[in-house]
Amino acid sequence: MTDQENNNNISSNPFAALFGSLADAKQFAAIQKEQLKQQSDELPASPDDSDNSVSESLDEFDYSVAEISRSFRSQQEICEQLNINHMIQRIFLITLDNSDPSLKSGNGIPSRCVYLEEMAVELEDQDWLDMGNVEQALFARLLLQDPGNHLINMTSSTTLNLSADRDAGERHIFCYLYSCFQRAKEEITKVPENLLPFAVQCRNLTVSNTRTVLLTPEIYVDQNIHEQLVDLMLEAIQGAHFEDVTEFLEEVIEALILDEEVRTFSEVMIPVFDILLGRIKDLELCQILLYAYLDILLYFTRQKDMAKVFVEYIQPKDPTNGQMYQKTLLGVILNISCLLKTPGVVENHGYFLNPSRSSPQEIKVQEANIHQFMAQFHEKIYQMLKNLLQLSPETKHCILSWLGNCLHANAGRTKIWANQMPEIFFQMYASDAFFLNLGAALLKLCQPFCKPRSSRLLTFNPTYCALKELNDEERKIKNVHMRGLDKETCLIPAVQEPKFPQNYNLVTENLALTEYTLYLGFHRLHDQMVKINQNLHRLQVAWRDAQQSSSPAADSLREQFERLMTIYLSTKTAMTEPQMLQNCLNLQVSMAVLLVQLAIGNEGSQPIELTFPLPDGYSSLAYVPEFFADNLGDFLIFLRRFADDILETSADSLEHVLHFITIFTGSIERMKNPHLRAKLAEVLEAVMPHLDQTPNPLVSSVFHRKRVFCNFQYAPQLAEALIKVFVDIEFTGDPHQFEQKFNYRRPMYPILRYMWGTDTYRESIKDLADYASKNLEAMNPPLFLRFLNLLMNDAIFLLDEAIQYLSKIKIQQIEKDRGEWDSLTPEARREKEAGLQMFGQLARFHNIMSNETIGTLAFLTSEIKSLFVHPFLAERIISMLNYFLQHLVGPKMGALKVKDFSEFDFKPQQLVSDICTIYLNLGDEENFCATVPKDGRSYSPTLFAQTVRVLKKINKPGNMIVAFSNLAERIKSLADLQQQEEETYADACDEFLDPIMSTLMCDPVVLPSSRVTVDRSTIARHLLSDQTDPFNRSPLTMDQIRPNTELKEKIQRWLAERKQQKEQLE
């Protein structure tokens, strides 16, 4: 029979329809015939064989069809066996059949498969796969070292199919099993119902074999299983099938959890985290690949079993070593930043290199690009932490413990010595980048309750910060994971042990963690930024000087400037990511609200309206660490310096900050630390409008802040609080209080000036002055009187110091210009240069401050006069003004003519103008004018004539010059009269003279402890600065002194007698 006849015969058989193709039916028939032949060959020959042979009487192919019909009991058996074989081939891309592809149909058969030769030999004549041998076949496939060498064509197609080769010959067994899992999933959706259990079984096989691969990876030669897992996830994230991979992993993880006899799940997965750690640590902030790895970790922190392994994996070897946390997987991530990896080393730094060669626009573009990556980076870290906190109580406890222990181990970052010894610092503690990123992520966690009216905000319980050491179980029960906060200095001393609750909410823990992280990170970086800024200025000045003098040091200075500028721009960029700053501002405004509510005794969850006078009951502040308030102030000052636009765009929330400043600046009962209260004045200066700044076209300048500041409901209390802290910092108890007070008062002058220009504040200040005028002799000197006394003290000291430094600078400049330094040794010359630079810095500081103090006196005296002309203050302010005029307009002025006034902020014209303004403001008062000539040290008619000449020279308005000339004439007339009187009273006995001032007493009083008699005005001035008896240092107040009526009457009788004698002589 021909092939054509054979095909026709088989095709006419009804069972042929069960096969995928005629070729399949023909192949099956051939196999069956061969098997029967082998069986007949093995049996002994029968004598009747030749006679009884049916095959001889039947056509060869008719016989084959008959055998097919007899071999299967039903159509279902034939169909299932063939379809299972095909399905297994499609899923696992393996086969036992290496027959001619032309004999196979392309229907339902993959184009390429791995031929399992050894297994085919072992099974001898079975060349199909079934559920009985598929597991063995899959295992054999997994053991092949190079499956690509075992590929065979399953179809007769000659078209090159690279994807089929790649899929079937996949060498990486983890990826291969995942692909099998996906193909099995697809089969489940397509196969008929009778094959569905077999498809599911194949799918389960991929999972169980993947579990085996992970449990015993050593069996599989040259297969890095864990690397393959990571690469598979990485590829999935970068593609669009991540959910498919995670579905597969979920089932594998479940299988691993159910079978931990060989290895625990943690042991299986730790190598995966090792790989991630090794890969991530070398990545940069702006590398896209970093974010793919972070997405992998995001999945792991969402998956409950992987998350448990993760929180165990990130535990440092030594929990007490702060730097060790940076070496963990989470720490390596947190250490990624645009900050320098090694402090001071800009080589190989990828950001802001050679900044002087970049335009401002190019630098802004780079900064904006980094900020985009930072925003994404912080979001990923935040999501990881959020996942761990929400996943389970176990992961929540573990991650909070990690954070608490980390902060405690790094608490030394705030120590003064740590900043002075950077080499040791970076060996002991985690980096600035670590804490900046951690702070940014924690800030995001706080945002849900960082709203001024949030009821959740007020559930914060400050007693959390007073808890002492707890064991791990207690921490878990109480939800307390921070350590060592009980050793922090709090806003006020605690009077008694607080009542601790059973446990604390997450709001309390989040706030404490975030604030302490900011204190360890942002706070320190801000200090560094200020220092870098100062160093840049100094380097710039030195560089320009070197260029002008053609010094060989110019190139070196330029290189130093470039390096430092790179550090500055990198640090500034890291700290000014807009979303982080906005989140931090939200937190700090909320903290202002919280502290205000605690300060007025609110222990509920709903805010109470602020009213003055403040109610009693603020004991909770005894458990609030100072760094809560310090962070608030530090951040707002940072914004003023480096990101002022945010203050303007968020102006509406600043009212809460003004509430905070008003309460705590003016209340030593609620904030004991005078240094911290003084810092709040700097905070006030930071948030108030600055009308002298260059307007930003993108922001409505200072309009919104001006509105908030001018419409502030508690303007009188704020003005009083500012003046109170100005006075209080005179005596802080610090050994450096004298130098500190000038720095603390620096921001207060512009605030006072701005307040004076606003009606509500100016009236409040005048009210304080009126009260002081009416209570000059109160037991405690009135606040405003003490303020004016200190203001004049400062003015006298500062301008006098500035004059001294300018005189020294003048001398040194002359020496240098004459060439006297040229003959000095290089070391001596350097010392001279350093000395000149130091004098310059000191002169500049004292000039700035003296300009402010004299300017403040000028505007205050425009409407406040009675206090200044009172004997308590008049003599002091007059002697001060005359002394300064003597140096500024008299013969001594030549000693102050340094080369460049602006370099030292020396403004003699402004000073002369302000001093003359004060004279004119107070000149209407007769007793003030009468007191001017009594200044025997500096006053002379010539001095005022010289002043008029200078006023003309500096082009002051004509009406001012005329007014001052008239005042000078009036004072000269009074001086002549006083000279005559002094001659009359020149021989007064010592009993009538003040023992301190050696002047005739007008109102003698007796001091209670020393029993010494002094003039009332003398002791009153003394007590403004020092409330002790000047003769024995005993405590003394004005209400304790007693008038010496008898002596006063004697003086008055003597004066009357002398006057009468003089009249008789005339």
From Swiss-Prot:
Residue numbers carrying N6-acetyllysine:
386
Pathways per UniProt: Protein modification; protein ubiquitination
Q: What residue ranges are annotated as transmembrane?
A: none
Q: What class of enzyme is it?
A: transferase
What Pfam families does the record point to?
U-box, Ufd2P_core
Q: Which reaction equation describes what this protein catalyses?
A: S-ubiquitinyl-[E2 ubiquitin-conjugating enzyme]-L-cysteine + [acceptor protein]-L-lysine = [E2 ubiquitin-conjugating enzyme]-L-cysteine + N(6)-ubiquitinyl-[acceptor protein]-L-lysine
Mind telling me which InterPro entries this protein's record contains? Ub_conjug_fac_E4_core, UBE4, Ubox_domain, Znf_RING/FYVE/PHD
Name the domain of life. Eukaryota
Q: What UniProt keywords are attached to this protein's entry?
A: Acetylation, Cytoplasm, Transferase, Ubl conjugation pathway
Instruction: Name one cellular component (GO) term.
Output: nucleus
EC number(s): the record gives: 2.3.2.27
Every copy of the U-box domain together lies at 987-1061
What one GO molecular function would you report for this record? ubiquitin-ubiquitin ligase activity
GO biological process: one example: ERAD pathway
Q: Where in the cell is it found?
A: Cytoplasm
**Residues annotated as region Disordered?**
33-57
Record text about domains: The U-box domain is required for the ubiquitin protein ligase activity.
Q: What is the role of the protein in this entry? A: Ubiquitin-protein ligase that probably functions as an E3 ligase in conjunction with specific E1 and E2 ligases. May also function as an E4 ligase mediating the assembly of polyubiquitin chains on substrates ubiquitinated by another E3 ubiquitin ligase. Mediates 'Lys-48'-linked polyubiquitination of substrates.
Write out the similarity annotation.
Belongs to the ubiquitin conjugation factor E4 family.
Put simply, this protein is called Ubiquitin conjugation factor E4 A
The gene behind this protein is UBE4A
